[in-house]
Amino acid sequence: MPLRASEHAYRPLGPGTPPMRARLPAAAWVGVGTIIGGVVIIAALVLVPSRASWALSPCDSGWHEFNLGCISWDPTPMEHEQAVGGCSAPATLIPRAAAKQLAAVARVQSARSSGYWWVSGDGIRACLRLVDGVGGIDQFCEEPALRICYYPRSPGGFVQFVTSTRNALGLP
């Protein structure tokens, strides 16, 4: 007796459910999209603007840029008490290291200028002799000296991250 095709057809053992596709939940897609979007935004911030746009903010009016800080000075020699009280906040007397750099770069020693600068001494009367860059305190600083006010400018953490990333990638 010949077999019919319907007798040998596949028959499931029980009532089946439609096959389920493996899917990520919507929250996972939102999370992945947020991460990818954040990476793209940070990459655009790092790569698109020029290095100049990540520079330090300009010094205030009447101040001059010096390294990572701003300086202002009075060409009249004065006593320590006047010098300390003459710098407007957030400025203070120039730190010793910055004063040495400024003296070396500017070669400011002249017949009309004072031979000393007042420098920041954390409450101690401190000065810097311009001729040789030697610093001293108290009785070493007897004569009037020039007041140079200084305030530092520092880039924020994100700017440091951007500039170091650009340096690592060799970008201008």
UniProtKB/Swiss-Prot annotation:
Residues in the Virion surface compartment per record: 49-172
Cross-referenced InterPro entries: Herpes_UL45
The keyword Membrane appears for this protein: yes
Single GO cellular component term: virion membrane
Membrane topology note: Single-pass type II membrane protein
TM annotation in the entry: 28-48
Subcellular location: Virion membrane
Record function comment: Important virulence factor of HSV neurotropism. Seems to be required for glycoprotein B-induced fusion. Dispensable for growth in vitro.
Protein's name in the database: Envelope protein UL45
Keywords associated with the record: Membrane, Signal-anchor, Transmembrane, Transmembrane helix, Viral envelope protein, Virion
Residue ranges annotated as Intravirion topological domain: 1-27
Family in the record: Belongs to the herpesviridae HHV-1 UL45 family.
UniProt keyword Coiled coil present: no
